[in-house]
Amino acid sequence: MSLHASKRLKRWQLIALTFLLIAGIINFLDRASLSIANCTISKELGFSATQMGLLLSVFSFGYALCQLPIGMVMERFGVKKIYGFGLFLWSLAQTVTGLLSSFTHLIIARVILGIGEAPHLPTGVKVVNDWYNIRERGLPMGIVNMSSTLAQALAPPLLIALMLAFGWRTMFIIIGISGIILSILWFIFYRNREQLELTDDELNYLNDGAPPSSTNKVSFKEWASLFKQRSLWGMIIGFNGVGYMVWLYLTWLPAYLENSRGLSLEKTGWVAAIPFLFGALGMLVNGVVADYVVKRGADKMKSRKWMICLGLLFAAMFTLPAAYTDSTFSAVACISMALFSIHFAGTSAWGLILVSVPSRLITSVSGIQNFGGFIGGSFAPIITGIIIDQTHSFTLALVVCATVAFLASLVYFFFVNEPIKDPAEMEVKTV
């Protein structure tokens, strides 16, 4: 029995990771574009901080609501079709945003952007699950997650350069058209695992060490019964803390540096990139550490859980001093370490699914967990906008963010103690 990927599998692993890496970068450039143009758009169109907070939030509401059914839909129709359609839809919405001026129309475009991007992270989890052995999924999952934060690091200097050269509207259109082109390439080149005739050695490599799982499609009854499991609720509520902090910094960091720290637009682009580079590093480090400790004999589920809890705690600890320091250097350093820690935790949260959930439920549980994260992410921008309008400061907003992360670490610690069980197998045992 072979425990190594064949040359053909390695080729498909490379194709899959390359697509997800590029799509992840475009995905988060789309999300970051509004936060980068935050001050420019609010001045040009006359929007308040609360209105901008709402614009930044509605993306997450559309995204979060689609997370609940997206896993079941992807399991029924396949990753290739659903992700390809989502990539095309979100890129079209991004392109159209560059043509709009009405607050209402911008709200609608942002909601559609969120709906289109809904399959992205569940697709990453499913693709890694399909093409990698369970003992080797930490690093590829880290790379998939890293693409998003790498884009967040690229976004400030790249998007500000585009905005200064062509204006904010053309910036939106350029990024949107790039995504439309990638969606066409995805449809042409990507293949679902079921579309290939794998050899026995390839199947042995892919399935070795994985928990047994039924190959039947997930029914609505089985999907609904997942919510009876305590660990799933821990994942949903706990991931709120990850989503809240990620989205506070993603949506408001450029405005924070401009308004609270007095940086110019050009300088903001480069300084804002630093914390997101640390976030990308946190994802990559987590992937390496997760694979290392498992290969050294650590329990796959418990090790991920501890990394989540510690990551959330350190993220809270670094965010608090950023709220009170008078030094711009110290604030950026603390925020950088907070983003390193929160993305270290977030990557472990996705890795937790890969080692604690039966294969056929991977996309369903991924979507449900992501729903939790984006509920937190939905409220972070609007709550921050309201706090800024009321206090004319980011201090309270950062304190709230740190508190949410701390509480999320407690939820993971006390609630996530058992693997997710397959409802089909539970029914068989009770008969």
What are the functions of these language-model segments?
Residues 15-49, 120, 249-254:
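Extracytoplasmic
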Residues 65-104:
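Conserved MFS/SLC helix-loop-helix module at the cytosolic interface between two early adjacent transmembrane helices
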Residues 88-101, 310-326:
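C-terminal ends and interior cores of transmembrane alpha-helices
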Residues 109-149:
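Cytoplasmic helix-loop-helix junction between adjacent transmembrane helices
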Residues 144-195:
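Helix-loop-helix hairpin linking two adjacent transmembrane segments in secondary transporters
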Residues 354-391:
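A late C-terminal transmembrane helix in Major Facilitator Superfamily
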